[in-house]
């Protein structure tokens, strides 16, 4: 730093009594060329000697706005300072709204109580003429049902008697067919004829049993077998015997035809054919008995 001293006829400098360290009227500033904050020249006009002293720069200061609210410069600064940035006060913090729990769902409304059950109305008594009409309808229905049951029993009795007679005739004809023809042949030598003879015996015995049971039922109103099992037994046995008759007659017919083709026609195969024809008729009668027993089994008033 360069310091310059200059003697002038000015009063000697004096210090402020308040102790602020500033020079009073005995100091003067130099022109604008030496007015920088870095180089300051102080001239002393003391008559004894010129003294040079370094004066530190002042801190930057800011004055209040002279005319607030009217616009303008917004205040002035000292010569040796720059404009300081204005620090705006921090914005107030935004308060977060308090989190409130969601409202509880409303409770479901209680269902209304069920209405009281009203007593059922008393049944109306039918008029007297309706009772008379219902009685007139029931009695004929019962009588017709009894007549129908009696007719079915008579038909079943006749069918049993016919089946027993036919089976007896068939087995008698075939049993007499021994030592017949030019070969003196017998039915016992052929399995088909023996099978037909056995089935005719079974059919005859079963038909006799059914005939006796039906006669006892019609006379005393009592059957040898209880009612629920009786109809099922009759239906099953009629089906079985009818199947045996048709199968034995078919096999015996095939055997008799074979004998006629091989050895010619004579009395032996002719009697066998007669017995087979009677067995076929017995099968038809057993089929009718099966229909009657099925009606008795599946009728409504069982």
UniProtKB/Swiss-Prot annotation:
Residues 40-60 have a biased composition (Low complexity). It comes from the Eukaryota. The chain crosses the membrane at residues 155-175, 198-218, 239-256, 274-294. Signal peptide: none annotated. Homodimer and heterodimers. Residues 176-197, 257-273 are extracellular. It is found in: Cell membrane. PANTHER family: CASP-LIKE PROTEIN 4A2 (PTHR33573:SF53), CASP-LIKE PROTEIN 4A4 (PTHR33573). It is a multi-pass membrane protein. Residues 1-134 are annotated as: Disordered. Keywords: Cell membrane, Membrane, Transmembrane, Transmembrane helix. Disulfide bonds: none annotated. Residues 1-13 have a biased composition (Polar residues). InterPro entries: CASP_dom. This is CASP-like protein 4A2. One of its GO terms (cellular component) is plasma membrane. Residues 1-154, 219-238, 295-302 are cytoplasmic. Residues 99-129 have a biased composition (Pro residues). Belongs to the Casparian strip membrane proteins (CASP) family.
